[in-house]
């Protein structure tokens, strides 16, 4: 209350339109002027007040301005402790600027300020966000030297780091080193396995956690229900549903866990159960609506998905990029070409959302399935980012369906460049030649596969890939 009250005083003194510069200079006045009617602040209180000022920032630009003021005031040099550095880093992370957070950490190290048990988890998170796993491993060495390895926040951070890097043995090693591990470490290992598509292992870890006597929280349940959805195990889904009900509390909003149940049942093919949960929810957010739309689309319920999207807009809920992946996927499954084009254009024109690879993949897939291969090619050529193998694969699938040799020969080199080890493109190209009775070319492709020693991948087709 003291700090929030002082911030209010800093705002009301003087002009109405007080900006952060005015606040900062008044703060220095309160600290440095002994004749002030306000009791001068101690360095510790001043740092806490600056931390409060940072936490109240509503934009990245404001964080940068306050950081600049703090830097120019030389406060960080006068009081070389990690507290204020940590709060600056935390503010950058909160405003999705991990590179700035890392730069602050490097500045702290150059200033010979030792990181504390709160510093490292922030920088680990930043390193994970930009996939700088080399920096992450260096931070692990720092944690070992400073004796922070057993700290629960450092521990969970390193588990997440190694999982993201695909180094699951190292993640498990960090996890196993502490027999008194906390819930955060369990959540990190379960979440890491889930994101890596190792659903069975994630569920096994969840069972082990329950046996250890720890109760799951909403983060645990979101990860394990996602793993269950990946497995499509309805029996397990029912058991996890019970766990979610047990994990809910009156004090805590249950919207995250209920959204995870909608997603889980959708992936298990039970949209009736997903719909029941959705209808019973006291509160819904964009994730709730998007999970329903994506679920309907994945299960081939095109009309239901689009009706859900209509209702979402009617309720005034602003769609996000994931919402449009579901909407466009529904159009693909329903063969609704014109509607798909309209929704694709709507992303930018109505909601100022820049389409990503998944959205471009959907529209290319939609056009290719309809035989509009030239228009699909035009979309690919005009993409603002480099097409990935799935986008090329959708176009190649259309070539196979309609026997377009010229287009298939144009697409094939791009796919081979991206995945030279994959035989899928060769198989589809051979199929296109076979459809046109070009048997010499079919044989040429087969010989090329032998020459390049391309691995045979059974039952794989780019054309069947969905988003």
Curated annotation (Swiss-Prot):
One of its GO terms (molecular function) is RNA binding. Keywords: Mitochondrion, Repeat, Transit peptide. Pfam families: E_motif (PF20431), PPR (PF01535), PPR_2 (PF13041). It comes from the Eukaryota. The keyword Transit peptide applies. PROSITE patterns: PPR (PS51375). The keyword Transit peptide applies. Residues 391-466 are annotated as: Type E motif. It is found in: Mitochondrion. NCBIfam families: PPR. This is Pentatricopeptide repeat-containing protein At1g77170, mitochondrial. It comes from Arabidopsis thaliana (Mouse-ear cress). The lineage of its organism: Eukaryota, Viridiplantae, Streptophyta, Embryophyta, Tracheophyta.
